[in-house]
């Protein structure tokens, strides 16, 4: 389940009101960006957010993963993984996890698009050192 607490309106899950989000999740979003996001956001069927995800191939844990974390510092993420928090239970099982911090809100593609693009390119290029992978201004 991605988020079964999102409100269903007229049979779909729309982009919620901004008040639903923690203030940190909205970091970097100007009023103009928020209006543009709302104008272009598409509603999704309820099961997209609330339906169970069934994964069965254990080989997925052998695929290296890069997490570009915009709302949570690496230390907090790794602590949650170590403690078995359900939010990151699947991630904690992955053998090789690289975390790249990109401090901003939930939508880095809108608040820091150039920095996000640079971090993705570095991750795809196989950059394993988080500091080197995030060699962009913060």
Where are these regions (language model features)?
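Serine-dependent carboxylesterase/thioesterase catalytic core
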Residues: 1-22
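Active-site rim elements
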Residues: 21-25, 104
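Conserved serine/cysteine hydrolase catalytic core
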Residues: 32, 42-103, 107, 114
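Generic structural signal of hydrophobic/aromatic residues within well-ordered alpha-helices
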Residues: 21-22, 37, 91, 125
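Catalytic active-site module of serine/aspartate enzymes centered on a nucleophile-bearing elbow/loop
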Residues: 94-138
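Residues within well-ordered alpha-helical secondary structure of globular protein domains
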Residues: 39-43, 122
């Amino acid at each position: 389940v991605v988020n079964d607490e999102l409100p269903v309106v007229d049979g779909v899950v729309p982009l919620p009101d901004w008040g639903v989000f923690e203030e940190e999740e909205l970091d970097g979003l100007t009023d103009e960006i928020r209006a543009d996001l709302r104008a272009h956001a598409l509603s999704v069927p309820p099961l997209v957010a609330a339906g169970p995800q069934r994964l069965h191939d254990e080989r997925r844990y052998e695929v290296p993963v890069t997490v570009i974390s915009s709302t949570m510092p690496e230390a907090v993420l790794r602590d949650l993984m170590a403690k078995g928090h359900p939010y990151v239970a699947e991630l904690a099982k992955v053998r090789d996890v690289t975390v790249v911090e990109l401090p901003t809100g939930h939508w880095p593609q809108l608040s820091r698009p150039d920095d996000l693009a640079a971090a993705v390119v570095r991750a795809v290029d196989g950059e394993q050192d988080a500091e080197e992978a995030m060699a962009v201004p913060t």
